[in-house]
């Protein structure tokens, strides 16, 4: 499990348009975004699946609507002061990210399953990668 306090790529304000949420979720390459209000209070999470379901269920999807209108409030979260063991127990293949809040309910970090990929420059190398790293002695 990794606890990351650099959460800006995963955060969107509830008043921002859905279009911005889609752009952020695309940029962070993790398949989700955490919705907070102007005080940083956790309101919900939006995943790729939430967006797809919203598009399918909407007769006329409006990307300029505020994110708060489609946020999934049925989320799993934990307190940042909880034990690592109790936080890790909430993570599995279905739940790979958990927002962590302070005592006031503000999102201050995320917990996620350890990424099996190695990031080198802008390249992700993982178990399914067809890359090989070699050592050179120039």
Q: Where would I find each of the regions flagged by the language model?
A:
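Bateman (tandem CBS) regulatory domains
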Residues: 1-10, 64-75, 131-133
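Solvent-exposed alpha-helices and their adjacent loops that cap or buttress functional pockets
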Residues: 2-4, 91, 124-130
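The conserved cystathionine-beta-synthase
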Residues: 10-30, 36-37, 55, 76-95, ...
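Short beta-to-alpha loop/turn elements within the nucleotide-binding domains of ABC transporters
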Residues: 16, 46, 65, 82, ...
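Short beta->alpha transition motifs characteristic of CBS
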Residues: 27, 34, 41-56, 94, ...
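A short, flexible N-terminal coil/short beta segment enriched in small residues
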Residues: 39-40, 45, 135-138
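N-terminal positively charged helical leader segments and presequences
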Residues: 50-54, 58-69
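N-terminal nucleotide-binding beta1-loop-alpha1 segment
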Residues: 115, 127-138
């Amino acid at each position: 499990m990794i606890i990351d306090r650099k959460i800006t790529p995963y955060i969107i304000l509830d008043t921002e348009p859905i279009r911005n949420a889609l752009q952020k979720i695309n940029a962070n390459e993790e398949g989700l975004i955490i919705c907070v209000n102007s005080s940083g209070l956790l309101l919900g999470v939006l995943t790729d699946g939430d967006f797809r379901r919203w598009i399918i269920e909407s007769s006329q999807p409006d990307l300029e609507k505020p994110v708060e209108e489609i946020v999934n409030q049925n989320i799993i979260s934990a307190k940042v002061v909880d034990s690592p063991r109790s936080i890790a127990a909430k993570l599995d293949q279905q739940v790979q990210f958990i927002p962590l809040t302070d005592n006031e309910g503000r999102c201050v970090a995320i917990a996620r399953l350890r990424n099996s990929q190695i990031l080198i420059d802008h390249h992700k190398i993982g178990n399914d990668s067809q890359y090989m790293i070699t050592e050179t002695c120039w």
